[in-house]
């Protein structure tokens, strides 16, 4: 929790977060926001999402988009950064053909009590990807072994979480001036 709060505060102090109103659709069953892209061809959301409701709420966002070109350049200059080649090409294709949307990093505490409070606004919590990715720093730091265990030489992940590890995580590290 302490490392997550530290990284959040660092990024906030550097101006990497902003608050804005989210207007969209929310699946309570999947605990995720949905976009028009998530609708089936007939315009209906898949039953896997359960009841989907329109939602308006203020949240904090991480400015991923302003780091998009940096990440493209970094991956191009470091071809072994994402392997195998077809996964690197998948990430680069995504980055070069899509506009990277800023990442919502919070939920109002009144709606979601179990997250980690934002150190700069305790009416909000962060949860899931921001805190999960920051755990790669939390464990080595808590054991006093950060220099030995981080950064990792190789990081093996599943294909279903490629975007989080090959896009969000490196941008988070770069924005926080961490390796």
Protein language model regions, located:
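Feature captures the FAD/FMN-dependent oxidoreductase FAD-binding
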Residues: 1-16
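Short alpha-helical interface elements
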Residues: 2-5, 32-37, 96
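Structured secondary-structure scaffolds
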Residues: 2-3, 48-49, 55-179
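Short, polar/flexible loop-turn hinges at active-site or ligand-entry regions and domain interfaces
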Residues: 14-19, 78-82
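Cys/His-rich short segments
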Residues: 16-68, 72
